[in-house]
Design a protein with these regions (language model features):
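Pyridoxal 5′-phosphate
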Residues: 1-183
């Protein structure tokens, strides 16, 4: 990480230069503790330059940011419904159509022959509806949360001398604010 707790892309580049064979780089799209956002396109470019597979955990970002998997050069993307008011226990994985995987567990033909077991139909439908609603009201929701967050920042700064904000709070996830209080 660099001084502002962003992923150090130079270090990632250096690490990948020393790897032989297939490798998977997996990084959070948005950090849940300090709110930093990953420069996904830059990471994807670095990974492509080293023939590395790139997975991003988008749990904190899905439903709060528009993510176009056709434009972003991700190989894998995962998310979870509970972060945008979907059912707990329902999640998803996007796998780029150019990727060929073998099932980890043999069995039934669920999920295009990739997994065995009964599908959680209610969870899947609920997750689909939750993501639909999240994006339908994304702009209004974001404006409301940003207004509350900015008010909180302003009040903390005016009421508590020496208060600090961790991470890249001005350019980070608008739903997260990590605060340091003076001793």
């Amino acid at each position: 990480l660099n001084d502002n707790c962003h992923v150090n892309l130079d270090h990632l580049q250096e690490l990948l230069q020393h790897v032989e064979g297939p490798v998977l780089v997996t990084l959070m799209y948005a950090n849940n503790e300090i709110g930093n956002l990953l420069p996904v396109d830059k990471v994807a470019e670095i990974c492509a330059g080293h023939n590395a597979y790139f997975h991003s955990d988008t749990v904190q970002a899905i439903g709060h940011y528009r993510i176009d998997v056709q434009q972003t050069k991700l190989h894998f993307l995962t998310g979870s419904g509970h972060k945008f008011h979907g059912p707990k226990g329902a999640g998803f994985i996007y796998i780029n159509s150019n990727i060929r995987l073998k099932p980890y567990i043999a069995g039934g033909a669920q999920e295009r022959n990739m997994r065995a077991g009964t599908e959680n139909v209610y969870g899947i439908v609920g997750l689909g509806k939750a993501v639909e609603l999240a994006y339908e009201y994304l702009d209004e929701h974001r404006a409301h949360i940003e207004e509350i967050r900015n008010h909180m920042i302003s009040r903390l700064q005016s009421e508590i001398p020496g208060v600090g904000f961790n991470g890249d709070y001005e350019n980070g996830l608008y739903t997260v604010l990590n605060v340091s209080f003076p001793p």
